[in-house]
A protein has these predicted regions:
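Short, hinge-like loop/turn segments at secondary-structure boundaries
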Residues: 93-96, 167-171, 194-196, 252, ...
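Active-site region of glycoside hydrolase catalytic domains
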Residues: 97-210, 215-240, 261-264
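Aromatic-rich peripheral "rim/lid" segments of glycoside hydrolase catalytic domains that contact
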Residues: 244-301
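Generic hydrophobic, helix-prone segments enriched in Leu/Val/Ile
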Residues: 1, 92-96, 194, 214, ...
């Protein structure tokens, strides 16, 4: 999977609106140095009373998957209804299982460059409940996709600190563990409207102590990976666009390189919307962030 980017989670295309993200962007992503797209799917709202997915929604997804595969990209299908699941853990279960019943059957014959991610950032449930849900969803997938790679992360929003509580079947060697990283939140989420505790802006990042903290945090995950023999995906990381650009770029570069040094694949949050690496209205890369992610794209002059 190597280097990836999160896409289309908040695009109006899913609700019948005019799409910001176009199929042509897959080539742009590939040519921009990325090998993977993590498709952010908020599918529950597109289910009927029997938890069947809307055929039009599925057709839209098919088009995106096929267009990405045509460009040689790996596609992660990420079920991203974590907020709904946190609000009602019991009601989440039948929807999550129905989603994977339908998606695993629909994509059973796709190449192994289509990867399933069972649930983004589980939270609001105990570790035992999430481990049970993950095991049930994995069993559903394995009925039709016995060797497809499946991504599973720990609770508390895919927290590194919760990896030790993640339970994975030892005999299944087609599982990739995932974590997300936004440390320190005071820097990465400064000015974000949904995090009122981080209203202060202008916070810089990049001191030796800052860099050491990133290394120490990722070392915790790497120690778990080595002890458990599981590959890791850094499925999300990013700094909100209210942070100073120079510090955003420095942080992004540091986290991406730290992940690569440890042999992890990664997916930046995100292509469009906020935390962005690509300005769709201007039709151009946000150069400091793009170059931080993909150093080969830096202007040698």
């Amino acid at each position: 999977m190597q280097r990836g980017v999160n896409i289309i989670g908040y695009d109006p295309v899913w609700n019948g609106g005019e799409a910001r993200f176009q199929h042509r962007h897959f080539k742009l992503i590939r040519d921009g140095g990325f090998q993977t797209v993590r498709m952010v799917l908020q599918a529950f709202r597109h289910m009927d009373a029997g938890n069947q997915l809307n055929p039009r929604w599925l057709a839209t997804l098919d088009g995106h998957v096929d267009a990405a595969l045509a460009q040689g990209l790996t596609v992660i299908l990420d079920e991203h209804d974590f907020n709904i699941c946190a609000e009602d853990v019991v009601a989440c279960r039948p929807k999550l299982m129905a989603f994977w019943e339908q998606i695993s059957t629909r994509y059973a014959n796709k190449p192994n460059t289509v990867v399933f991610e069972l649930m983004n950032e589980p939270n609001g449930a105990t570790d035992a409940v999430w481990n049970d849900y993950a095991a049930e969803a994995l069993a559903i997938v394995r009925r039709t996709n016995p060797t497809r790679n499946v991504i599973i992360g720990p609770g508390s929003w895919n927290s590194i600190d919760q990896l030790e509580n993640l339970r994975l079947p030892a005999e299944d060697r087609h599982i990739i563990a995932t974590v997300h990283y936004y440390g320190p939140m005071r820097f990465t989420h400064q000015g974000a409207s949904w995090t009122p505790m981080f209203t202060e802006t202008g916070i810089a990042w990049g001191s030796p102590e800052d860099r050491a903290a990133v290394a120490a945090d990722l070392d915790k995950a790497e120690a778990w990976s080595e002890a458990n023999g599981r590959p890791l995906l850094l499925g999300e990381f990013g700094a909100y666009d209210k942070a100073p650009m120079a510090s955003r770029a420095a942080w992004t570069d540091a986290v991406a390189r730290a992940a690569e040094t440890r042999g992890w694949a990664w997916a930046y949050w995100q292509f469009d919307s906020d935390f962005i690496v690509y300005d769709i209205p201007a039709d151009r890369w946000v150069q400091p962030i793009h170059e931080a992610l993909i150093p080969e794209m830096r202007d040698p002059s």
